[in-house]
Regions:
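Substrate-binding/active-site clefts of carbohydrate-active enzymes
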Residues: 7, 13-20, 29-170
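NUDIX/MutT-family hydrolases
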Residues: 4
Length: 170
């Protein structure tokens, strides 16, 4: 459970993406955008990559799959916690600082949401949260995506719709 002592100070950030016009989007994975070997951080991305994106003439950055995920090899597309940014790259405040700084630079920020499937793991995430294999997915094989080795959402369920829309609002 993340509970910072002080709320994040957005310093009056009131970014208005509608003033940008046509978007020229730079897509990046925070953990893989660094030149060094290893997992990059939100802080490194803020300090080193955002200025390059701005200098190169982009007006938006799309952050690939930032939600918490147990397997780094999935590039963040095996989501386990839909309401938590990846702890591999830093703290939630460091991600907020990345967004705040991008806005200061005039860059819109687009967050890549993964709502097609989720990690099938039993120890992390929402699979078998209620003891069944179908709280958020169809039961049995119909709820399994073999190519991604993950669980599929059952979009016909009202609970799934509410869950995913809540995630969009988050």
């Amino acid at each position: 459970f993340w509970n910072p002592a002080e709320p994040f100070d957005w310093r009056g950030d009131a970014f208005d993406a509608s003033k940008i016009g046509s978007l020229l989007i730079y897509e990046a994975h925070v953990g893989m955008a660094q030149e060094r070997e290893g997992v990059g951080t939100y802080r490194e991305f803020t300090e080193k990559i955002l200025p390059i994106i701005k200098k190169d003439g982009y007006n938006a950055v799309q952050l690939m799959a930032v939600a918490e995920h147990p397997y780094y090899g999935s590039f963040g597309y095996h989501v386990s916690s839909f309401f938590a940014p990846s702890s591999r790259c830093g703290t939630p405040e460091e991600l907020k600082e990345l967004i705040r700084r991008a806005h200061e630079l005039g860059l819109a920020v687009i967050m890549d949401l993964v709502h097609a499937h989720y990690v099938k793991n039993l120890n992390e995430g929402i699979n078998s949260l209620d003891g069944t294999d179908h709280l958020y997915s169809p039961p049995g094989d119909a709820g399994y995506q073999q190519y991604w080795d993950s669980k599929l959402f059952d979009y016909g369920k009202e609970e799934v719709q509410h869950f995913l829309l809540s995630n969009v609002k988050y």
